[in-house]
Regions:
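Peripheral docking tails and interdomain loops at the edges
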Residues: 187-233
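Conserved thiamine diphosphate
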Residues: 1-47
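Redox- and metal-dependent alpha/beta enzyme cores, enriched for Fe-S-associated oxidoreductases
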Residues: 120-156, 160, 166-172
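Conformationally flexible catalytic loops at phosphate/diphosphate-handling active centers
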Residues: 38-123
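Short, solvent-exposed amphipathic alpha-helical segments in soluble enzyme
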Residues: 28-33, 58-61, 145-154, 174-178, ...
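Glycine-rich beta-alpha junction loops
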Residues: 45-52, 137-139, 190, 214
Length: 233
């Protein structure tokens, strides 16, 4: 449901904030990307981030496009002013299979363009890491503290935080599969992103999952223990 909101072979841009600041920033970014690619974008926030209180710096307000700018910049828009051009018909329904296939091929080309240009992720202490914690949202913040505790014990751990869950940072994770001994995917679920990580790693290193369910937020020590028991042992 993150990559695509349902059936139909389509994909959604999914942004995963890890702070209240990013919650605010990603609203503007989500609209910007949705407008740029004419593609739905979703902000995949978790309950922990949603209940946090932090200082936020809001961006300067941008002026709205004038009607003339909309017509110039958005030739696809249904503005109600079709003088001088053919009407824009906006629909996902094509009754002819041949026409529908052409549409779908065009969409797939757009998705490849998004995958090439819009992958976002954060790396923390990955330069010398022997083990990697892969996490998004609030779990990435908890994982960062777990990384610090692990390094105090002499375990070289880095964090890779996907910011876009689609497009997913597949190439970045695949590159680390040649450098680290194992990866622990930490999530507030029974295991969802781990499948994407395993596909990226392609069996090169061990990939295991640690998660808590039902709204329970784990302690950083639990992640360190999971790393030691599932990956390092």
């Amino acid at each position: 449901t993150v990559k695509g909101g349902g059936h139909g072979d389509y994909k959604l841009i999914a942004l995963a904030p890890a702070s209240v600041q990013e919650m605010a920033d990603f609203v503007a970014l989500g609209f910007e990307l949705a407008f740029k690619y004419r593609n739905p974008a979703i902000i995949l926030a978790d309950g922990v981030i949603g209940q946090m209180m932090e200082k936020v710096v809001l961006p300067a307000q941008k002026p709205r496009r004038t009607d003339a700018e909309v017509i110039e910049q958005c030739p696809w828009a249904a503005t109600g002013k079709a003088k001088g051009r053919k009407p824009n018909i906006i629909t996902s329904l094509e009754l002819k299979p041949e026409a529908m296939e052409i549409n779908n091929i065009r969409f797939q080309a757009k998705y490849k363009q998004i995958e090439e240009n819009e992958v976002r992720f954060e790396e923390i202490n990955c330069e010398d890491a022997e083990y990697l914690i892969v996490a998004f949202g609030s779990m990435a913040r908890i994982g960062q503290k777990a990384m610090e505790l692990a390094r105090e014990k002499g375990i070289k751990v880095g964090i890779l935080r996907p910011i876009t869950l689609w497009p997913f940072p597949t190439k970045a994770i695949a590159a680390y599969a040649d450098k680290v001994k194992g990866m622990l995917v930490t999530e507030l679920n029974a295991g969802q992103m781990i499948e994407d990580v395993r596909l990226a790693v392609n069996g090169k290193v061990k990939v295991e999952h640690f998660g808590r369910l039902g709204g329970i937020v784990p302690d950083p020590d639990e992640i360190v223990t999971a790393l030691e028991e599932k990956i390092i042992k």
